[in-house]
Curated annotation (Swiss-Prot):
PANTHER family: NADH DEHYDROGENASE [UBIQUINONE] IRON-SULFUR PROTEIN 3, MITOCHONDRIAL, NADH DEHYDROGENASE UBIQUINONE IRON-SULFUR PROTEIN 3. One of its GO terms (molecular function) is NADH dehydrogenase (ubiquinone) activity. This is NADH-quinone oxidoreductase subunit C. Its main location: membrane. One of its GO terms (cellular component) is plasma membrane. It comes from the Bacteria. Belongs to the complex I 30 kDa subunit family. Residues 1-20 are annotated as: Disordered. It is found in: Cell membrane. It catalyses: a quinone + NADH + 5 H(+)(in) = a quinol + NAD(+) + 4 H(+)(out). It is a peripheral membrane protein. Keywords: Cell membrane, Membrane, NAD, Quinone, Translocase, Transport. NDH-1 is composed of 14 different subunits. Subunits NuoB, C, D, E, F, and G constitute the peripheral sector of the complex. The lineage of its organism: Bacteria, Bacillati, Actinomycetota, Actinomycetes, Mycobacteriales.
């Protein structure tokens, strides 16, 4: 197995993106409103920033991945820019933001091309950016090439009003339960999944608990003889 350079920080373009996107302004420590602030953290104000598109050269082995993927897509009659919204290099890590209609084609090329060979998908992570209008829901796929000892991420977005993303089950079958969990907690519908049902919450549960618009609540719990109130009734810290 080949080994990549051990010091990617020396590569050109590794420092990150040329533009940054402000998607929200967060106030307070935890974003909870309407409760008493006993800590002083309620006065914190900070911008929530996402890295923008990175310029060439990306550095490290990232340019080679982009070039080989572009060649593979071109052979199938797909332009790189039509499949990839942007390429982001941030903190020495490569993320390809993929248009959802091109996700299956991109994933299959990354898996099957001999010079790419990303044989392993490490799952899928859901993210909810409620203030990123039209792109509120994100699915993030970490990929690894065992052959070439390389890593990258695929990131796909969908609007709240149409939370559909193609399932990668056909390309990476081990994503089965990962996509079910992301559906369960974020409400992303993975089209083509063989059995997209809840995996942790009860079947009749209302809502998706890891979304940022999910209400803070709960039920009282008895612990060592004491009655612990649900989170929304406890002492406030913002």
């Amino acid at each position: 197995m080949s080994s990549p350079d051990q010091n990617p920080s020396d590569a050109a373009g590794q420092t990150g993106s040329s533009n940054e996107e402000v998607v929200d302004v967060r106030r307070g420590m935890f974003g909870v409103k309407g409760s008493g602030d006993t800590s002083g953290y309620g006065r914190l104000v900070r911008e929530i920033v996402l890295p923008g598109s990175s310029p060439r050269p990306y550095g490290f082995y990232f340019d080679e991945i982009a070039d080989r993927l572009a060649e593979a897509l071109n052979r199938d009659g797909v332009e790189f820019e039509d499949a990839i919204e942007k390429v982001v290099v941030y903190r020495n890590e490569l993320t390809l933001h993929v248009r959802r209609e091109a996700l299956l084609r991109v994933a299959q090329s990354l898996r099957d091309e001999p010079e790419l060979r990303f044989e392993l998908c490490l799952g899928v992570n859901g993210v909810h950016y409620p203030h990123e209008t039209g792109r509120e829901l994100h699915a993030v796929y970490p990929l690894q090439s065992i052959t070439h000892n390389r890593r990258l991420r695929l990131e796909v977005s969908a609007p709240d009003s149409d939370p559909h993303i193609p399932s990668l089950y056909a390309v990476y079958p081990t994503n089965d339960w990962h996509e079910r969990e992301t559906y369960d907690f974020f409400g992303i519908i993975f089209d083509g999944h063989p059995s997209l049902t809840r995996i942790e919450m009860p079947d009749d549960w209302q809502g998706h608990p890891q979304r940022k618009d999910y209400p803070l609540g709960g039920i009282p719990v008895e612990y060592k003889g004491a009655q612990i109130p649900p989170p929304d009734e406890r002492r406030g810290y913002n």
